[in-house]
């Protein structure tokens, strides 16, 4: 077994053990779509109240898994935006109840695909948050029904773009949404500190992937929102275990993609254990195969006696 497989197995077993503990109030609707929850974990725990809409959205669910389990109550809206679903799969399976709102959100759907299929019932609310939509595309297509909340959150929208276009959306009566700007992955803690006059939203700042646990601890005077912190992908299980007195939101923790990720220190600890086991195995093989060792001598004598 490779080190990667060893760590993956440890993580798998660790998740199983955590799920067995009733003291944690997991929300299985959210947990079902958590990328740490694999198909094997779902199959091994049929007693859990898994949510099939969440499972349908889970990035570990492939098209092969869906095809091999047609009896499951799949949600085709969520399957439609599952990142494992490509346009080729959709076109090759026209009999399936694909959902075009879901397809509009699918990260495999590019602007070229949208342009090549103008008569499809695209949903511009979801297209606006599609990671393939750039600012140039938005500027060149003013006539489209863009959703400015989702544009504000779109990872292709940088702080420089926002600053340079603060007036343009307002004139079009489509202002930037500062709630979603607060969550935008291009917004850093330095930007927030340097712009205290902006109508930041602390729920979404608390969730912003640039906000680390160290930043939160170093700025306890800020109005952090524990619902957002609970969904922040910098929060891992070690942080939660060491801070059980905090007002964690278990619904959002269940949805946190990093919640079951192993910390670097834990991976180092597991790696040391792995290589220690390897050394023990190698040493044992040396002991039983090298006549210089007593255990090998005894083995050879025993095998010789069995032959006569």
Regions found by a protein language model. Name each.
Residues 1-270:
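Alpha-helical scaffold segments
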